[in-house]
Amino acid sequence: MGQCLRYQMHWEDLEEYQALTFLTRNEILCIHDSFLKLCPPGKYYKEATLTVDQVSSLPALRVNPFRDRICRVFSHNNVFSFEDVLGMASVFSEQACPSLKIEYAFRIYDFNENGFIDEEDLQRIILRLLNSDDMSEDLLTDLTSHVLNESDLDNDNMLSFSEFEHAMAKSPDFMNSFRIHFWGC
């Protein structure tokens, strides 16, 4: 691991990042400091990028069963700019609004990226959440059917964004569970 050039963040940049995210000034500065430690040597932080492997190995993501999907959704061409990292941290912050969290949760859970959370996606979500590869096919089918019975309002065996949004809005635990504290900030 290298180190970026240790430029102080300009006050104007800090204010802009604070206006564009749900992060506090201190959180942005903490993320900036951590980013500097991980990025390639000799690069200015605005020009530097981190690899998906670097980001997915962060303690906050290393144990997350959806780390590969999170990285796919927030990275660009499998690399993270400083602003990509800020965007990811902002969405997973406590202050992020429910609609933003729901939008990104949908994108993360849409494994096949077809614009719906279908049976295949639901099965992958269930297996990851339960950390189980040896679940019986019958139980997996029952759990998937139960989720669809509760949330699939038009009975097409998949969840549109609006159906997913409706289900998450009724879930009291969603806002608390869709949080990640990055960088130890």
Swiss-Prot record:
Tissue: Isoform 1 and isoform 2 are expressed in testis.
A molecular function GO annotation: magnesium ion binding
Binding-site list for Ca(2+) 2: D152, D154, D156, M158, E163
Residues holding Ca(2+) 1: D110, N112, N114, D121
InterPro entries referenced in this protein's UniProt entry, alphabetically: CIBP, EF-hand-dom_pair, EF_Hand_1_Ca_BS, EF_hand_dom
Miscellaneous information on this protein: The binding of either calcium or magnesium may significantly increases the structural stability of the protein in comparison to apo-CIB (calcium- and magnesium-free form).
Subunit: Interacts with ITGA2B (via C-terminus cytoplasmic tail region); the interaction is stabilized/increased in a calcium- and magnesium-dependent manner.
This protein's name: Calcium and integrin-binding family member 4
Species name: Ovis aries
UniProt gene name: CIB4
